[in-house]
Amino acid sequence: MLPQIPFLLLVSLNLVHGVFYAERYQMPTGIKGPLPNTKTQFFIPYTIKSKGIAVRGEQGTPGPPGPAGPRGHPGPSGPPGKPGYGSPGLQGEPGLPGPPGPSAVGKPGVPGLPGKPGERGPYGPKGDVGPAGLPGPRGPPGPPGIPGPAGISVPGKPGQQGPTGAPGPRGFPGEKGAPGVPGMNGQKGEMGYGAPGRPGERGLPGPQGPTGPSGPPGVGKRGENGVPGQPGIKGDRGFPGEMGPIGPPGPQGPPGERGPEGIGKPGAAGAPGQPGIPGTKGLPGAPGIAGPPGPPGFGKPGLPGLKGERGPAGLPGGPGAKGEQGPAGLPGKPGLTGPPGNMGPQGPKGIPGSHGLPGPKGETGPAGPAGYPGAKGERGSPGSDGKPGYPGKPGLDGPKGNPGLPGPKGDPGVGGPPGLPGPVGPAGAKGMPGHNGEAGPRGAPGIPGTRGPIGPPGIPGFPGSKGDPGSPGPPGPAGIATKGLNGPTGPPGPPGPRGHSGEPGLPGPPGPPGPPGQAVMPEGFIKAGQRPSLSGTPLVSANQGVTGMPVSAFTVILSKAYPAIGTPIPFDKILYNRQQHYDPRTGIFTCQIPGIYYFSYHVHVKGTHVWVGLYKNGTPVMYTYDEYTKGYLDQASGSAIIDLTENDQVWLQLPNAESNGLYSSEYVHSSFSGFLVAPM
């Protein structure tokens, strides 16, 4: 019986296919009106609205009608006919449903849309404690909490000095302070090297001395020059001259010793500093005190599910939406201490409770991470004086900055944020024990109300006993370094020791002229314009004067401007050089007669600054510097008295290539002179 089922299915399929083919593909075209009903064909009458031309094929020769044969298999489809012209007909009625096709494995369909989330099921039994997960990334900082009530201010022992913070931005220059007490005169430093500053203005003239008595007129010949006398006694210090122009800043000196700590009023609170570099993650803190149980949640209790087997630890998923709080479960076993979580926002202030019993003193916990500074709290009651702290190590002296211009006094700045919270103080005094009330029946859970206003601060408790000093807290963020207001001037110190004698003052002005003396003509006096008599006077040589003293002198002029740097300046135009002790080719004067010489020079400055030096045997004796003013022709000069021995050499030289504006021309002369004052 079973093998005949496929045969019957094939026969039924062939019958259906043949009937369908006869009705669809053997329907005549181009016929209007009702068609005859036959047993073999059934045509549905329809109306053709198109007025197009019906295309018909060529009519063949009609054959004799043969007997009806059995239905054969459907032949292959013929070639497509010529395209017809006409409007599309009306949509036909739906055909009969075909037989069910053979079952086959289809392609997977497009995944459907996610269904609606079902209702939350009941809480299953508490699972086993899973392995400690990796700490998640640090969340963003929460909003600043509402400042709490002012605590009892108890000064603790000062902690150790923290590390030096990063230097803040440069503050505005403060007001000029009062001049300090002059210090002791330091030792004379070594000779510095630098461009000489401008000469200061001439000081005030000294007091006029009394007029001396006029001496009797002397009679006699002029004597020879005497030996130079001993240097005079150091005169009294003159009045200080007016302050000269400010010279260029000198090189930075070494940092001075730390002065004594001053006593001044605390400056106004500076602006809040820039946030410091985030510190490293601290050690995990001790577990906190368990908070009060939250309000009961609202949820439909579901059927308790069966406890499933523990599956493998999956990857940490993303944070889901916050669900409603379920009923309080049974307390489980204490799990392992996890890493400290991020600090949540501060909750609303609760109603102040009654004073509880003082708990035992806990151990000092590790320092927690620095919290965000809260708003400035109310001022607490003054605490007892703490023990004096250990003096901190003196910091390094910073480099001396350039003096800034005194700025206007600014308005007092906004109060800065309070510092980090101090360590937890000791417990207060034991309060009065309260009466335990009777436990009332548990009411139905109410709808959580809106957040109420912040309550007033509670009554401060009695100050407790002074606790042990806590561990030093982490260093706070670096604040903006601002200079505080100048403190009041302290009392004058004791008089210092007598200072060193000052430098001699400037010479005073000349005194009034004395009475005229009597004119007495000495023997051998020669009037102006009168030629001396040569009778009895010996002839003199080029190296010897009239009196028989040796002579050595010269005056030369520079004919070309801007001489070479680092070599003697060759003054090549000679006004006087009879002894030939000066060489115009090299610009060097060579001493032939040992003695005391006087040298002077006068130069012009054009184009840039000039710095000229007088050298003796390659060593500079003195310098002259002139700062050039654009559009002007400046002058500079110098002179010196030098003792020379035989074969000593003296010359002028430009030591610096940046200050070489020595100028000389045909009508603007720069000169160099020297002569023997006294032989030795």
UniProtKB/Swiss-Prot annotation:
Renumbered residue ranges of the record's region Nonhelical region (NC1): 520-680
Record's keyword annotation contains DNA repair: no
Chain ranges of the C1q domain: 547-680
Compartments where found: Secreted, Extracellular space, Extracellular matrix
Gene Ontology cellular component annotations, sorted alphabetically: collagen trimer; collagen type X trimer; collagen-containing extracellular matrix; endoplasmic reticulum lumen; extracellular region; extracellular space
A biological process term (GO) from this entry: skeletal system development
Region annotation Nonhelical region (NC2): where it falls in the sequence: 19-56
Pfam family, one: C1q
SMART domains to which the protein is assigned, alphabetical: C1Q
Post-translation changes: Prolines at the third position of the tripeptide repeating unit (G-X-Y) are hydroxylated in some or all of the chains.
Region (Disordered) location: 55-523
Biased composition (Pro residues): 137-147, 207-216, 506-516
Skewed-composition ranges (Low complexity): 149-169, 268-289, 324-340, 366-403, 426-453
Annotated segments matching region Triple-helical region: 57-519
Listed Gly residues bias regions: 314-323
A molecular function GO annotation: metal ion binding
Signal peptide: 1-18
Superkingdom per UniProt: Eukaryota
Keywords on record: Calcium, Collagen, Disease variant, Extracellular matrix, Hydroxylation, Metal-binding, Repeat, Secreted, Signal
PROSITE patterns: C1Q
Chain sites annotated for binding Ca(2+) 1: 626-627, 633-634
Residues binding Ca(2+) 2, per UniProt: 634
Disorder cited: Schmid type metaphyseal chondrodysplasia: Dominantly inherited disorder of the osseous skeleton. The cardinal features of the phenotype are mild short stature, coxa vara and a waddling gait. Radiography usually shows sclerosis of the ribs, flaring of the metaphyses, and a wide irregular growth plate, especially of the knees. A variant form of SMCD is spondylometaphyseal dysplasia Japanese type. It is characterized by spinal involvement comprising mild platyspondyly, vertebral body abnormalities, and end-plate irregularity.
Record's function text: Type X collagen is a product of hypertrophic chondrocytes and has been localized to presumptive mineralization zones of hyaline cartilage.
Description of how the protein assembles with itself and partners: Homotrimer.
Protein name: Collagen alpha-1(X) chain
